[in-house]
């Protein structure tokens, strides 16, 4: 074998092919080419690939003059389909550049005007992916790794060259199918897909879809490559290439033809193209409506429900196969996408989309299509109601004319009913709904929410006239009870949606608020006693609590009956308990609610009574929130909480960084906008109701902060005047009188700051004096205690002396008698009894 290997001189072959001469020379060239093919029939060594490629190029040039070179050229190309062979492991790396260039040359050879050559090139490329080892190997050689050729094809940008070659086989079906087959294999690589996209592969393949092909392979191969491009390359770039009217029209024609197809493969291809159409529809720039494709899809999506004849779907028959089921879901999905495009609203309205979707809003006792299984019908039902949530806000008039509110309310009534129903819960939309009706309830409420969120009076009135408030409260009560058994994201979402719907319905309508207060407050109160740890569970408790607070604001505040009922049920206490958690995202809304409630005189009384942990008062809590807010906003304060800058005492760090920007009169300045964004204005409003005097539970630092809060509105006025002054001076020079006024306002603001600083200083000095006085009192107590202890010690020492020294005892006795005698009156009283100072029979020395 080695001897044979050395007997083929490739340099000699190349030199021979470069000669052009007589007929005999041509025969000699063909003979030597056959010898080369025979020699390498078991595979090409990597070291010879570059020379074989040069021989290929020379043969291609010869072929233009002599057709006899076609066969040897094809035989040489066939060698590239065999495994390359290496002598050393390092050969794969050492010859990688030469091999990449050689494989790239295969792509360039697609320009050779020979069908046989083009087909053989494609066959060899396909062989890269189905590598079979030859019967024999060259002695001392091993085949390269299985992916070696594929990697070198990526390096040589073979896929890009093949895409460009599609233009050369435009009218040659067999060659085109082989090129597509090769591209199909190449498109399994993300790198090759990227190269194909650069060569505009998506648009070229889309135009291939509707080509004449009795076998049907053209459409399947093209769609498969398009799928790979969408998955492995830039989806945005692929969609951008398919957005031309010509491409969309071609896609539509193929889809319409496949609609009437009866083969299983036709249905599969139809669904594949429908997915591609869905991806295109997501891009507003794609002319789906202009091409008429959108109308075809909408009519097809609704034809089985509305049962109205339409020429666009003539010949289409639903077979209830799995492919038709998948198509139905894809069409529902397309309807949801079209609902986001305002220009498609008319098409959706004219083609009965609303009645088609509402067809599924009914209980599942009798499935709409007898040929769908129960699980399939349930999946379609849930999908349709989910799409209804997207379509309904776009077609409000149709929604109302079809009595959708009535259908949804009746359906929701069935959802909380006791009649037996076993849901499968297999689909995406059916999650958490196995064995119950929670999935149906969830999507029905989502549809209601989407329409109510429009704040359309006609929708709200229509709902309330049908008793929606009472019914929604019943459903909310049902969901709350179910949550006690087993809490989950679906039940939390249901409760959140109901609270939102009630908020919109009751807002600005006292009569509806009264209806809500009958049962709603009792249901609402428990939400405010939620375990704070649940807010971080990630299940949606935080959204539920915010919805409950929003519902309280919209459904209770403003109606005295509802307010009194809420306050009597300890509602203000619960709100303050929540506020004491100091959750950043809750504080603003809770303070806003308390400000609204503060118009009710009972509110301030309850706020004054409330006590939190460690006997904290409402005033202390509000002051703590104020200090934390100023810390977050970067307001400058000293270690005692006193004002540092008397000219700008409450300005935030953000405001200080802002340059002077002249604004129109209708546009609020930073000082005004800060009021709505910060909680300080709300805290100030609450203190205006609570009062600034005789507030229990406050420390000296609290009183220092309270002095700032008390003058908040004055400081704000000063801020606004400073902004006015800065804006005027930026553009103009004020006249003398205006200059005087601006200066006066600035001085007033500065004086206010100094006054507050003086008050704060007085508070601190008073506290300091009190601390000194307390310290003196404590010192006196310590001194008295020490004196007492010394006296006790002295007494104890005397006692020890008397008990251990008899002479001392006698002396003490004598002293005692002398003291007794001295204490007696000198004048004797007649018949006075004589009292002995000795205790009889006493044997102690005390």
Could you tell me what each predicted segment is?
Residues 272-275, 329-333, 382-386, 443-449, ...:
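Well-ordered alpha-helical segments within folded domains of soluble proteins
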Residues 39-42, 391, 401, 462, ...:
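Alpha-solenoid helical-repeat scaffold
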